[in-house]
């Protein structure tokens, strides 16, 4: 049994032959995630873990880990981790500083990505495989182990489309938000999706406490299809309806991610298309400057973005510009591609100053 892979109910079932109490199961679960005990033996030796449970753990349990290949720090404090998995493939996670208070960890959910968004470097890798739950969680665990402040949020905005790895990412989020797990608020966990409509509807129906961010980028279908091929499979009207259902079920504004591209999607007609598409749906819009190392797509000029924000006032919705940091180390939105360049290579810490 892989202790990093199991939710609390799954762990209870796996330990059933040892007839543990609910307290003992919770102690094992907390030992793995909340207290980050590094080995099976360390978990087995935790207080209130009975001998029969400890014996079962030593006989059957394992706790695999990702290998940190490299850490790179940008001038703005963003740190990109390059991991190698024993199951094959390399993935990246980003430690994002939030003022002086906490970190948010941006995690990957797949090795590569099948969606091939035209401005995204991950999509150029193609799809290799889905990550298992433990591989997702271990990204957070290893970043947390080296952090000098608490990890207060997780965003599934790294490599891959999280809703195409639904079971594993949802289980990971459930463990992240569990009080005996990572104890991260469900509202501080966000899944970014390019618009996989069946998974969005499933998510809405199941009523999870986590948040979705919808990558729209253009409300003009012909424009959207040029940069987001998923538009051809799940057309904008279907996506808009799924977003409407999500917003109504949660009684909150839907977060619309809009990648701002110079000379492409920042005209008055683009704002008017957004207004028409989301009529009657409460939304908030996050503007994100495109980061494309190939140079095919350029970020907006200051004048262009200012004018577009003025155009967006017709939405009567909150508009924010999301900072996409770590550009020189390939840590910005859309640039994760298991690359090694730029910034400062950080040594392996001699100690673990983590604040759990």
Residue spans for each PLM region:
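Conserved alpha-helical substructure of the radical SAM core
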Residues: 123-153
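Short beta->alpha linker loops
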Residues: 131, 195, 324-328
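Short linear Ser/Thr-Pro motifs
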Residues: 74, 108-109, 192, 215
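Auxiliary Fe-S-binding modules of radical SAM enzymes
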Residues: 1-91, 244-253, 259-356
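P-loop NTP-binding catalytic core
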Residues: 87-97, 101
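Canonical Radical SAM [4Fe-4S] cluster-binding loop centered on the CxxxCxxC motif
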Residues: 97-135
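Conserved AdoMet/S-adenosylmethionine-binding subsite of the radical SAM
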Residues: 144-153, 158-322
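Generic beta-strand structural signal
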Residues: 79, 91, 103-107, 115, ...
């Amino acid at each position: 049994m892989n202790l990093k892979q199991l939710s609390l109910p799954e762990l209870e079932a796996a330990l059933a032959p040892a007839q543990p109490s609910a307290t003992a199961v919770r102690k094992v679960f907390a030992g793995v995630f909340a207290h980050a005990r590094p080995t099976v033996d360390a978990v087995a030796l935790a207080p209130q873990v009975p001998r029969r449970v400890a014996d079962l753990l030593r006989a059957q349990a394992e706790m695999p880990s990702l290998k940190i290949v490299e850490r790179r720090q940008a001038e703005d404090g963003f740190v990109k981790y390059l991991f190698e998995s024993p199951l094959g493939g390399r993935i990246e996670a980003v430690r994002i500083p939030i003022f002086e208070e906490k970190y948010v960890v941006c995690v990957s959910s797949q090795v590569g990505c099948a969606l091939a968004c035209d401005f995204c470097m991950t999509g150029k890798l193609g799809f290799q495989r889905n990550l298992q739950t433990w591989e997702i969680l271990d990204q957070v665990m290893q970043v947390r182990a080296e952090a000098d402040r608490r990890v207060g949020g997780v965003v599934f905005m790294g490599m891959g489309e999280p809703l195409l790895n639904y079971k594993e990412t949802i289980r990971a989020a459930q463990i992240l938000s569990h009080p005996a797990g990572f104890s991260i608020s469900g509202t501080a966990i966000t899944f970014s999706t390019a618009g996989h409509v069946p998974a969005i509807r499933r998510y809405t129906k199941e009523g999870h406490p986590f948040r979705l961010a919808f990558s729209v980028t253009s409300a003009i279908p012909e424009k959207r299809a040029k940069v987001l091929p998923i538009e051809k499979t799940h057309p904008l009207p279907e996506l808009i309806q799924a977003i409407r259902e999500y917003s109504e079920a949660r009684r909150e504004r839907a977060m619309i991610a809009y990648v701002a591209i110079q000379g492409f999607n920042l005209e008055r007609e683009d704002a008017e298309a957004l207004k028409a598409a989301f009529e009657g749906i409460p939304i908030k819009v996050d503007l994100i400057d495109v980061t494309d190392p190939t140079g095919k797509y350029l970020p907006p000029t200051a004048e262009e973005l200012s004018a577009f924000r003025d155009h967006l006032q017709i939405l009567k919705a909150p508009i924010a510009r999301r900072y996409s940091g770590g550009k020189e180390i390939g840590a910005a939105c859309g640039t994760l591609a298991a690359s090694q360049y730029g910034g400062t290579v950080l040594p392996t810490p001699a100690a673990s100053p983590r604040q759990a």
